[in-house]
Amino acid sequence: MTNYAIILAAGKGTRMTSDLPKVLHKVSGLTMLEHVFRSVKAISPEKSVTVIGHKSEMVRAVLADQSAFVHQTEQLGTGHAVMMAETQLEGLEGHTLVIAGDTPLITGESLKSLIDFHVNHKNVATILTATAQDPFGYGRIVRNKDGEVIKIVEQKDANEYEQQLKEINTGTYVFDNKRLFEALKCITTNNAQGEYYLTDVVAIFRANKEKVGAYILRDFNESLGVNDRVALAIAETVMRQRITQKHMVNGVTFQNPETVYIESDVEIAPDVLIEGNVTLKGRTHIGSGTVLTNGTYIVDSEIGDNCVVTNSMIESSVLAAGVTVGPYAHLRPGTTLDREVHIGNFVEVKGSHIGEKTKAGHLTYIGNAQVGSSVNVGAGTITVNYDGQNKYETVIGDHAFIGSNSTLIAPLEVGDHALTAAGSTISKTVPIDSIAIGRSRQVTKEGYAKRLAHHPSRSK
C-alpha cells in the first residue's frame, strides 16, 4: 500500500488578525503546520505535498526539504487547492490523505486508523467525521437510510433538515489517488461561496456508484480547525493537557498541572517533581529525581539527575547531576555546570563552565569564565568581562577562594588554591597558592564623625 499526503497551508487566516500566516501560529511550541506534519508521518507517506500561498516562503521554511511544495496563487476553495497538487501526484497508484494545516490536535493514531479503515473497506473516498454538540459552521454528513454517506453539505448550502445533523466533516479525507484527480476535473463553483468545494467529489463518486465511507473520530477535540485566536487558545489548552498527562503516565509528578506550561519537544524522566507555574520550552531534557519549584523557567537546556532548581531561569545551559540552582538565579546561554555545583540566590552565569562542587551562593555575576572544581565564590563577586567592545575570559583554578565583593577584571587568571581578599579589585594574574589583596588600607580617624552633618551633636 502506497500512501501520499496533501497538506493545505495556503490560506491567510484573516480572522487571526495577524501578519503571520495562520498555519505558522504556534501551539505548545510548534507551529500548527509542524503538528500536522508530524501526525501525517504516522501513515508513512511516500510523498508529501504542501499547498502554499500567502507568504509562501515563510511557510516553506518551516518544512524545508521534508515536503514538496505547490503554489496556490488564488484561494478559490479546498477543491482548487488540491488541484494544485496534480503536477506532483497525478497518475500515481495509491491512497492520498488530504488534511488542513490548521488542525494541530489531530493525532497520528487517528490518521493511521483512517487509512486502515479506507483500505479495509475498499473505499474510493473516506471522510474523517466527528459528532458535534453544536455543528454550526461545519459541513454536514448526509447519509441514506442504510447509513451510507451520500453527500457533504456546507453550512451555507444546507437545508433545515441538514442543519440539524450532528455528524460533521472534519476536512480530512483519504482518496484513491487517481480517482481524486479525475473527479476534481468535474467540480464547479456553482454554490453559495462561488468556490471549488473538495466535498463535491463525494457526489461525483456516488453518482458513479463508487464506494464512499466515513470514519468517526472518538475525540471531537481532534477535529478542531483553528480560524481565530479563540480556537487557538482552545487548541493550546487541549495540547497542554495531553502533554502533562503523557508525562504523568510516564512517572512525572505535577503538584498543580493546570498551571504548568510544557512544550511538545520537552523530555522529562520518571520521578521528577514539578511544582506549579513552571515553564519548560524548546528542546529541554529533565533528568530523573530532579525537583523544579514554583516559578522556574527553563528553555533549550539539559538538566541532570537529582538537581533542584528553585524559582530560577535557565536558558541554553547544561547541568550535570546533583546541581542546585536558586532561588532567583539566572543561567544564560552557554553555561555548563558540573556535578554538585551550587548556584545560589541572585547569581547570574553566562557563557561559563563551572567545575564540580563549586559554590557561588549569593549576589554574583560570572560571565565568560572557566571556573575549576571546589571553588568558593564569595557574595558580591563580579567578573568584569566587557570593555565596551570586546568580551574577555576569566580563569579560576581548582580550590580557589574568591573573597566577598571581589572584582575580577578580565582577562585574568587566578591559580589553583589561590585566594583573593574580600573587597579586592584584581586585574593581574594570581599565581597558584597565592593571596591577592587589591584594596586600600583602612584609615580610622577617631572623633571625626562629630564634624559631619549627620551626627546628633550637630542638630543642637
UniProtKB/Swiss-Prot annotation:
Region (Pyrophosphorylase) location: 1-229
EC number from the UniProt entry: 2.7.7.23, 2.3.1.157
Record SUPFAM superfamilies: Nucleotide-diphospho-sugar transferases, Trimeric LpxA-like enzymes
Localization terms from the record: Cytoplasm
GO cellular component terms, A-Z: cytoplasm; membrane
Region described as Linker: 230-250
Gene coding for it: glmU
Involved pathway(s): Nucleotide-sugar biosynthesis; UDP-N-acetyl-alpha-D-glucosamine biosynthesis; N-acetyl-alpha-D-glucosamine 1-phosphate from alpha-D-glucosamine 6-phosphate (route II): step 2/2; Nucleotide-sugar biosynthesis; UDP-N-acetyl-alpha-D-glucosamine biosynthesis; UDP-N-acetyl-alpha-D-glucosamine from N-acetyl-alpha-D-glucosamine 1-phosphate: step 1/1; Bacterial outer membrane biogenesis; LPS lipid A biosynthesis
Binding locations of Mg(2+): 102, 227
Protein name per the record: Bifunctional protein GlmU
Function per UniProt: Catalyzes the last two sequential reactions in the de novo biosynthetic pathway for UDP-N-acetylglucosamine (UDP-GlcNAc). The C-terminal domain catalyzes the transfer of acetyl group from acetyl coenzyme A to glucosamine-1-phosphate (GlcN-1-P) to produce N-acetylglucosamine-1-phosphate (GlcNAc-1-P), which is converted into UDP-GlcNAc by the transfer of uridine 5-monophosphate (from uridine 5-triphosphate), a reaction catalyzed by the N-terminal domain.
Highest taxon above the source species: Bacteria
Subunit structure: Homotrimer.
Organism this protein belongs to: Streptococcus pyogenes serotype M1
Cysteine pairs bridged by disulfides in the record: none
Cofactor comment: Binds 1 Mg(2+) ion per subunit.
Cofactor entry: Mg(2+)
Catalysed conversion reaction: alpha-D-glucosamine 1-phosphate + acetyl-CoA = N-acetyl-alpha-D-glucosamine 1-phosphate + CoA + H(+); N-acetyl-alpha-D-glucosamine 1-phosphate + UTP + H(+) = UDP-N-acetyl-alpha-D-glucosamine + diphosphate
